[in-house]
Curated annotation (Swiss-Prot):
This is Holo-[acyl-carrier-protein] synthase. The gene is acpS. It is found in: Cytoplasm. Mg(2+) binds at residues 8, 58. GO terms for cellular component: cytoplasm. One of its GO terms (molecular function) is magnesium ion binding. It comes from Streptococcus equi subsp. equi (strain 4047). InterPro entries: 4-PPantetheinyl_Trfase_dom, 4-PPantetheinyl_Trfase_dom_sf, ACPS, Ppantetheine-prot_Trfase_dom. Pfam families: ACPS (PF01648).
Length: 118
C-alpha cells in the first residue's frame, strides 16, 4: 500500500549559486558515497547531480510527512544502479521507496513514492 508521495522542483542555477558561495554545501547535502561520485564529475554535471540529490531528498522528506528538519540530508542516500536509475539506498523508512529524478531546461524534478510492506 502506498503510504506517502512527495515531489520537489529545483532550479539548478539556485543550487549552483549556493555551491559557488560555499563548496561545503555539497558536504551538507551529499553522503560520503554520493560525494565520492560527485567529485568525479565536470562542473555542469556536478550541479545537475547536486540539484537532483537535493530535490530527491526533499521529495523523500515530503513523502515521509516530515520535511527536512526532522530528517537530515545525511539520513537519505540516492545512488544510481548499473542502468543509471536512481535508487534510495539508505533512509529511515522501513518499507520500499521508489524515486524518479528528471532534468529539463534549468530545472530538476524528483518524485518519491513510499510503499508499506505490511
Amino acid at each position: 500500500m502506498i503510504v506517502g508521495h512527495g515531489i520537489d522542483l529545483q532550479d539548478i542555477s539556485a543550487i549552483e549559486k549556493v555551491y559557488l558561495r560555499n563548496a561545503r554545501f555539497a558536504r551538507k547535502v551529499l553522503t560520503d558515497k554520493e560525494l565520492a561520485l560527485f567529485e568525479q564529475f565536470s562542473h555542469h554535471r556536478k550541479m545537475t547531480y547536486l540539484a537532483g540529490r537535493w530535490a530527491g531528498k526533499e521529495a523523500f522528506s515530503k513523502a515521509m510527512g516530515t520535511g527536512i528538519g526532522q530528517l537530515t540530508f545525511q539520513d537519505i542516500e540516492i545512488i544510481n544502479d548499473s542502468k543509471g536509475r536512481p535508487v534510495i539506498t539508505k533512509s529511515p523508512f522501513q518499507g520500499k521507496a521508489f524515486i524518479s529524478i528528471s532534468h529539463s531546461g534549468g530545472y530538476v524534478q524528483a518524485s518519491v513514492i513510499l510503499e508499506d510492506l505490511a
